[in-house]
Amino acid sequence: MLLQVILLVSLTAILPCTGQFPLYAIPDKLGPWSPIDIHHLSCPNNLIVEDEGCTSLSGFSYMELKVGFITTIKVSGFTCTGVVTESETYTNFFGYVTTTFKRKHFRPTPESCRKAYNWKIAGDPRYEESLHNPYPDYHWLRTVTTTKESLLIISPSVVDMDPYDKSLHSRMFPKGSCSGASIPSVFCSTNHDYTLWMPEDSNSGMSCDIFTMSKGKKASKGGKVCGFVDERGLYKSLKGACKLKLCGISGLRLLDGSWVSIQNHEEVKWCSPNQLVNIHDFNADEIEHLIVEELIKEREECLDALESIITTKSVSFRRLSHLRKLVPGFGKAYTIINKTLMEADAHYKSVRTWDEIIPSKGCLKVREKCHPPYNGVFFNGIILGPDGQVLIPEMQSSLLHQHTELLESSVIPLIHPLADPSTIFRGDDEAEGFIEVHLPDIQKQVSGIDLGLSEWERYLIIGISAIILFILAIIFTICCRRCKRRKKIRTDHIELDRKVSVTSQSGKSIPSWESYKSRQGHSRS
């Protein structure tokens, strides 16, 4: 504690009377470089303030956030889309079969989606069988429609959960969020009426796996807890803390933005909506000295950069600048050589003006001489620009805009297809490209006799058929009349033959005129 007070007093003594924070701190002694792992990075303890009189220490266990917590929690899930696959077959007069497949959508139920997902992850053969289109049936001169309802599962589908109110956030949700999900029926509607989102684990629902158990020492004074020493040996004060629930667990949000599950017997107010974890909104009366305020802000930026490095598995020169020592004293320096993260022991000194460390173009003054860069890289985020200028991230000048992150993030988050606006379906057939199919029951519909004609062709054939039938009826009528006429003529001839028979003078009947004449000739002779 004495060394900390001496450090703080000496730091205050070297500052101007205006109370401004030192412009920069740079090593005046720099040890050899050695490679380190990304998980060995740490933020320097620039200021440790212990509460006066809190000398009674006792061991205790507490919960804190896991490393990598960045105010949102990744929840793995899947989407379930209801699809109706329809096969339509038509068999013409000659037996030729034409099959047409169509696809429509319907809104599935959460229970059926969970069952389909369990089939998929368990390797159930019923799921494999459901990947096929419905088997088309056919009947002669008929149209047969066969439909199969499908539950299409896409996994994984990762969304963000807000630990403060446990709401889910993703671009696939209407208005970007889903706040109506509850255990045990956890599901969210998406931008498509026929698609639901559900978490992979139905038992845990939307539980938060962001906490870790740690051991520390509680500092108290007269039975009142005023701070604690965490597992890493850093003392944290409860002064200015407020109550905050994360994932339903009560705890305290400390002044530096960290969260612990420690309970304080003193009456503590609830945090305001703008007081979030790792996001600070300090008031002037909460900070006793401007130096302390600046150190806390710089530490938070360092913690944010460290969290970003660990979660993205990516290091940039800009992020390394946050890990440097801010005040005079011993610390660490970092750089990147041959794409390898390097560390060196260093002793920092205070800098009041930039001219002290950049006396000329391209010269970074360290240990009273120009420090040589390695492929344009110095250390702590300081690089050599294309024009030969030394670029320091903290420099408040036009050169700051020229400083870019030379090492991009190597981790690309998995984005669900529905979360990409470019993949929003324009038609029913566009859902086939990236969807896996689960198909339950099959339904068949057999139509009446169908000649496979369009509506206007059908009416045209009906009209022509009517005309042909009318003509055939006329022809049939004419033929019938002619047949009747011929039959009548035959009947008339027979009656005429009967009427022309005569009787001779002898009283005998003569059947015809010729026989009568012949008989008259014989009688005369």
Curated annotation (Swiss-Prot):
Offer one Pfam family short name for this entry. PH_Rhabdo_glycop
Write out the annotated subcellular location: Virion membrane
The family this protein is said to belong to: Belongs to the lyssavirus glycoprotein family.
Identify one Gene Ontology CC term for this UniProt entry. membrane
Query: What Gene3D superfamilies has UniProt attached to this entry?
Result: 2.30.29.130
> Where does this chain mainly localize?
virion
In the UniProt record, what gene is named as encoding this protein?
Answer: G
Q: Would you tell me the protein name for this molecule?
A: Glycoprotein
Task: Write out the ranges of the annotated region (Disordered).
Answer: 505-525
Q: Where is the lipid attached (S-palmitoyl cysteine)?
A: C480
The residue spans the entry assigns to the Intravirion side of the membrane are as follows: 481-525
Note, other = Arg-352 is highly involved in rabies virus pathogenicity. Its mutation dramatically attenuates the virus.
Q: Which post-translational modifications are recorded for this protein?
A: Glycosylated and palmitoylated by host. Glycosylation is crucial for glycoprotein export at the cell surface.
- Chain ranges sitting on the Virion surface side read 20-459
Residue intervals passing through the bilayer: 460-480
Q: Which UniProt keywords apply?
A: Glycoprotein, Lipoprotein, Membrane, Palmitate, Signal, Transmembrane, Transmembrane helix, Viral envelope protein, Virion
Applications reported: Primary surface antigen capable of inducing and reacting with virus-neutralizing antibodies. Almost all human and veterinary vaccines are based on the functional aspects of the G protein.
Which residues are reported to be glycosylated?
N338
Q: List the disulfide bonds.
A: none
Q: What does this protein do?
A: Attaches the virus to host cellular receptor, inducing endocytosis of the virion. In the endosome, the acidic pH induces conformational changes in the glycoprotein trimer, which trigger fusion between virus and cell membrane. There is convincing in vitro evidence that the muscular form of the nicotinic acetylcholine receptor (nAChR), the neuronal cell adhesion molecule (NCAM), and the p75 neurotrophin receptor (p75NTR) bind glycoprotein and thereby facilitate rabies virus entry into cells.
Q: What membrane topology is given?
A: Single-pass type I membrane protein
| Native source species | Australian bat lyssavirus (isolate Bat/AUS/1996)
Q: How does it assemble?
A: Homotrimer. Interacts with matrix protein.
**SUPFAM superfamilies from the xrefs?**
Viral glycoprotein ectodomain-like (SSF161008)
Q: Does the keyword field hold Transmembrane helix? A: yes
Q: Which residues form the signal peptide?
A: 1-19
